Amino acid sequence: MKFNKLSEQNLSGKRALIRVDMNVPLKNGVIGDDTRIRASLPTIEHCLKAGAAVLLMTHLGRPTEGEPKPEDSLAPVVARLSELLGKPVRLIADFHAGVELAPGEVAMLENVRLNKGEKKNNDELGRAYAALCDVFVHDAFGTAHRAEASTHAVAKFAPVACAGLLLSAELDALGKALQAPARPLVAIVAGSKVSTKLTILEALADKVDQLIVGGGIANTFLLAEGKAIGKSLAEADLVEDARRVIAKIRARGGDVPLPADVVCAKEFAETAAAATKNVAEVVADDMILDIGPDAAKQLAAIIAQAGTVVWNGPVGVFEFDQFGNGTKTLAQAIAQSKAFSIAGGGDTLAAIAKYGITDDISYISTGGGAFLEFLEGKELPAVAILAERAQ
């Protein structure tokens, strides 16, 4: 897919409108984690260095359109951004009369989700945004799966529409992992429900050499292979779907390696006693909360041989240390592997942070839903419009 890149644009004296993702956790006006603000800095600084006037826009939370409340304001975000940039950042409540900005200055439009028509991708609002710039820069991969006025309509009407540094890097990394992967391609897909990730599992079944499943998803796959799982979280109605995924991969010469041993408990609790056992020994009141050490070793060996690893989801309840060994072992295997690795999803990022392997993953995706939809092979509307504008 070809799209215009920010790095190719002449920005001297131009007005750059950048759609960033600064939807940070806020409690009582205090930012809980500023990772997303920091992730946007390279694109902002690139535009400033190139001589542009920089206008930013982002959403924050889920406010009601047309009904601004103090807690929906970007004021705390703007204050933090100003600290990080070391320069003032203006917050603009009303942009309809235009925005006066000199090259080297930075301003932020108030929360785009307060604007009527934002969620519905309203063309009139898109035109109003586009009128504020010479170059529109999309740099919010986390919102790329949504067609909204600040991600899609604006890109239709801006004089130039391009991908920012973060979005370009994200698309390059995902393309490398899925469109032309170094083989073997190993995907780790874990989570509580097959139903939420069935389309991903089916899409990956056509691409991967090894599909490692974990969590409640693995329990459903164990059921599909005729194993007893006690009172573990699973979806009995999706057993046939799981069988179909297994058959599809095996028909291509790949596999879904399921654990031969597991770590069980009688209750789901931080204080629960962990018991490691062979899958054949699982009894009616057991809950499987992690893969066993033998399974972890076997999967780590598969990862060690991989050319590409795509990771979405921890394989056990790693928040409780006694059920974290499986995720920790796989995380360390990915960190030590020579494979190109890409990881995404909130729980996955928490596991990466917990086991201190951030610097050992080739690419950490910033997009939750967008990352998953890309894995499914779905077209991301905000990326598709950039490709269209590049023609």
From Swiss-Prot:
Pathway: Carbohydrate degradation; glycolysis; pyruvate from D-glyceraldehyde 3-phosphate: step 2/5. Gene3D superfamilies: Phosphoglycerate kinase, N-terminal domain. ATP binds at K197, E319, G345, G346, D347, T348. Its main location: cytoplasm. It is an enzyme of class 2 (transferase). It catalyses: (2R)-3-phosphoglycerate + ATP = (2R)-3-phospho-glyceroyl phosphate + ADP. It is found in: Cytoplasm. GO terms for cellular component: cytosol. Keywords: ATP-binding, Cytoplasm, Glycolysis, Kinase, Nucleotide-binding, Transferase. Monomer. PANTHER family: PHOSPHOGLYCERATE KINASE (PTHR11406), PHOSPHOGLYCERATE KINASE 1, CHLOROPLASTIC-RELATED (PTHR11406:SF23). HAMAP family: Phosphoglyc_kinase (MF_00145). This is Phosphoglycerate kinase. The lineage of its organism: Bacteria, Pseudomonadati, Pseudomonadota, Betaproteobacteria, Neisseriales.
